[in-house]
Swiss-Prot record:
Pfam family, one: GATase
Additional remark text: Component I catalyzes the formation of anthranilate using ammonia rather than glutamine, whereas component II provides glutamine amidotransferase activity. In E.coli and certain other bacteria, component II is larger and its C-terminal two thirds has anthranilate phosphoribosyltransferase activity.
Domain Glutamine amidotransferase type-1: from-to ranges: 3-196
CDD domains membership: GATase1_Anthranilate_Synthase
GO molecular function, one term: anthranilate synthase activity
Protein name: Anthranilate synthase component II
Keyword annotations from UniProtKB, A to Z: Amino-acid biosynthesis, Aromatic amino acid biosynthesis, Glutamine amidotransferase, Lyase, Multifunctional enzyme, Transferase, Tryptophan biosynthesis
């Protein structure tokens, strides 16, 4: 079971994601991205083995409220999982580029190829997933491992040492056929090195 602070980037998918996580027994608290980063860091410090999850949302990562500041201040200090806009924010935070994907997707099912490692272990390959995006990450820096792609576009990244990962697609969507398992394996991967104490306290 994980204690998850879910940052809501003002997106209806946030609540689908929260429902999926809660149905698997995780504790989830939701805060919108207009809350000051310091307030959320203080809230995370009260949680037992916290995980920060960054939701999908409209627009570009740099304009998503406190999300860029949270990544700057918390990367490497606790596990962070980003979805869609959250994934793009992770790419930017590590020095990558986020630009137009060349098409606007809203509920498009695509079969992505993945490396079969870590959170993708044992999953169907190619894996059918749901894509809702017009932007995509590129020029991925050396610190991030590209662990899934579709037609040359980056669909997932991870940073093993910092316990940070991002998915361009939506694991919580019914169109992502093994999304619930992927989320569970991602949380297990993210928490693998956590000690019983909270390093933010």
């Amino acid at each position: 079971m994980a204690d998850i602070l879910l940052l809501d980037n003002i997106d209806s998918f946030t609540y689908n994601l929260a429902d999926q996580l809660r149905s698997n027994g995780h504790n989830v608290v939701i805060y919108r991205n207009h809350i000051p980063a310091q307030t959320l860091i203080e809230r995370l410090a009260t949680m037992s083995n916290p995980v920060l999850m960054l939701s999908p949302g409209p627009g570009v990562p740099s304009e998503a409220g406190c999300m860029p500041e949270l990544l700057t201040r918390l990367s490497g200090k606790l596990p962070i999982i980003g979805i869609c806009l959250g994934h793009q924010a992770i790419v930017e935070a590590y020095g990558g580029y986020v630009g137009q994907a060349g098409e606007i997707l809203h509920g498009k099912a695509s079969s992505i190829e993945h490396d079969g490692q870590a959170m993708f272990a044992g999953l169907t390959n190619p894996l059918p997933v749901a894509r809702y995006h017009s932007l995509v990450g590129s020029n991925i820096p050396a610190g991030l491992t590209i662990n899934a792609h579709f037609n040359g576009m980056v669909m997932a990244v991870r940073h093993d040492a910092d316990r940070i990962c991002g998915f361009q697609f939506h694991p919580e969507s019914i169109l992502t056929t093994q999304g619930a398992r992927l989320l569970e394996q991602t949380l297990a991967w993210a928490q693998r090195k956590l000690e019983p104490t909270n390093t933010l306290q």
